[in-house]
Amino acid sequence: MDDIETRVRKLVAARFGVEECDIRLDSDFRNDFGAESLEVVELVMALEAEFGVEIADDDAERIETVRQAIDYLEEAVPT
């Protein structure tokens, strides 16, 4: 099974139409990929489905970069 970072990168690439090689850990969903608020919400929903977790609205609002998504999931996903 792919690790969390690899899975997040694949989801981000698919959601925002970018190449995985162009995704940096500090890539900002809005500023670097031009994502609108709804697109970020859809990404959060995809992350929830992919990893089988529920991301609280307050937490979701703080996930703005690839690294923040990975860090959150590393804490939330049971090992």
UniProtKB/Swiss-Prot annotation:
Protein's GO biological process: lipid A biosynthetic process
Keyword NADP tagged: no
Protein name: Acyl carrier protein 2
UniProt domain Carrier: residue ranges: 2-77
Residues with PTM O-(pantetheine 4'-phosphoryl)serine: 37
PANTHER family reported in the protein's UniProt record: ACYL CARRIER PROTEIN, CARRIER DOMAIN-CONTAINING PROTEIN
Lipid metabolism found in the keyword field: yes
Matching InterPro entries: ACP (IPR003231), ACP-like_sf (IPR036736), PKS_PP-bd (IPR020806), PP-bd_ACP (IPR009081), Ppantetheine_attach_site (IPR006162)
HAMAP family reported for this sequence: Acyl_carrier
Keyword annotations: Cytoplasm, Fatty acid biosynthesis, Fatty acid metabolism, Lipid biosynthesis, Lipid metabolism, Phosphopantetheine, Phosphoprotein
Pathway: Lipid metabolism; fatty acid biosynthesis
Organism: Pseudomonas aeruginosa (strain ATCC 15692 / DSM 22644 / CIP 104116 / JCM 14847 / LMG 12228 / 1C / PRS 101 / PAO1)
Protein's cellular compartments: Cytoplasm
A single cellular component GO annotation: cytosol
Modifications the protein undergoes after translation, according to the UniProt entry: 4'-phosphopantetheine is transferred from CoA to a specific serine of apo-ACP by AcpS. This modification is essential for activity because fatty acids are bound in thioester linkage to the sulfhydryl of the prosthetic group.
GO molecular-function terms, A-Z: acyl binding; acyl carrier activity; phosphopantetheine binding
Role summary: Carrier of the growing fatty acid chain in fatty acid biosynthesis.
Record family assignment: Belongs to the acyl carrier protein (ACP) family.
Signal peptide: none
